[in-house]
């Protein structure tokens, strides 16, 4: 993924960088694979803010991505590599031999007219999907299922990759991008390779307007709000929060308090927690 740097001909471009989009094909998305996306703007069905700092943004069409990869034993060809406004990575349009078309996540290194397949005995090549039990140790994978047949739920962000580090019985041990080491059933499917756009974390937005295009609004500190708006608000002048511990706008513990449930069913499958938890 190449990065384009701007000259400082305006304050907004002084530190701005964007992808060069060398890999993608300029084309319209498939109509049958798109539908309108309702932007919730951080509100629930009653209009109450449940997630702050969201709203606005450019209109988007949602591209339906094939996370299940359940079209087995039929080869498909990479027709296009397209931009997707709903995620940081690109997507690929697959033309299958029977005429069906589907979108998949863009694996790093795949090229136009390459062939992919999903089956139990698929070769270990980039873009192919097969069960974890048929993959050798050390294989780099993405779009990993947690429950067999449910579709990929892990390792779908730009530049991410997981590795198979052990097999024992009916379980496979994976090292996830977060540093977590987790057990997954050998029957689960995964796709070979790393997700594209590995340098997405090196991009610099450059100006506040670019954040607004993405639907992200300014963040206001709770300590400068009124007491009705935030538990940290109020006071005369610059005052401390006035509480023993920091709280969220809804009064729950914040800044370091773990929100994961105790005795969750998957605790026995997590051998090591992620690095930042």
Swiss-Prot record:
CC terms in the record's Gene Ontology section: chloroplast; large ribosomal subunit
GO molecular function, one term: transferase activity
GO biological process assignments: translation
Superkingdom in the source lineage: Eukaryota
PROSITE patterns assigned to the protein according to its UniProt record, in alphabetical order: RIBOSOMAL_L2 (PS00467)
Region spans: Disordered: 223-277
Gene3D superfamilies: 2.30.30.30, Nucleic acid-binding proteins, Ribosomal protein L2, domain 3
Subunit structure: Part of the 50S ribosomal subunit.
Protein name: Large ribosomal subunit protein uL2c
Gene: rpl2
């Amino acid at each position: 993924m190449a990065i384009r740097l701007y000259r400082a001909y305006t304050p907004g471009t002084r530190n701005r960088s964007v992808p060069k989009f060398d890999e993608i094909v300029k084309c319209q998305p498939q109509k049958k694979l798109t539908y309108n996306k309702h932007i919730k703007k951080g509100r629930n069905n009653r209009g109450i803010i449940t997630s702050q700092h969201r709203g606005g943004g450019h209109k988007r069409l949602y591209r339906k991505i094939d996370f299940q990869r359940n079209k087995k034993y039929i080869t498909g060809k990479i027709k296009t590599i397209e931009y997707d406004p709903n995620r940081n990575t690109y997507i690929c349009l697959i033309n299958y031999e029977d005429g069906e078309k589907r979108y998949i996540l863009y694996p790093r290194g795949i090229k136009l007219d390459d062939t992919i397949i999903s089956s139990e005995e698929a070769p270990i090549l980039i873009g192919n999907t097969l069960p974890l039990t048929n993959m050798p140790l050390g294989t780099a994978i993405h779009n990993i299922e947690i429950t067999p047949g449910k579709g990929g739920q892990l390792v779908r962000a730009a530049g991410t990759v997981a590795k198979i580090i052990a097999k024992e019985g009916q379980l496979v041990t994976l090292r996830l991008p977060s540093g977590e080491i987790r057990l997954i059933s050998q029957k689960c499917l995964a796709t070979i390779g790393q997700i594209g756009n590995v340098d997405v974390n090196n991009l610099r937005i450059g100006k506040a307007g670019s954040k607004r295009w993405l639907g992200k609004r300014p963040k206001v500190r709770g300590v400068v709000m009124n007491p009705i708006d935030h538990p940290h608000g109020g006071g005369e002048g610059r005052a401390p929060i006035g509480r023993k511990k920091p709280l969220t706008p809804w009064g729950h513990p914040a800044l370091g308090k773990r929100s994961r449930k105790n005795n969750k069913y998957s605790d026995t499958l997590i051998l090591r927690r992620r690095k930042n938890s």
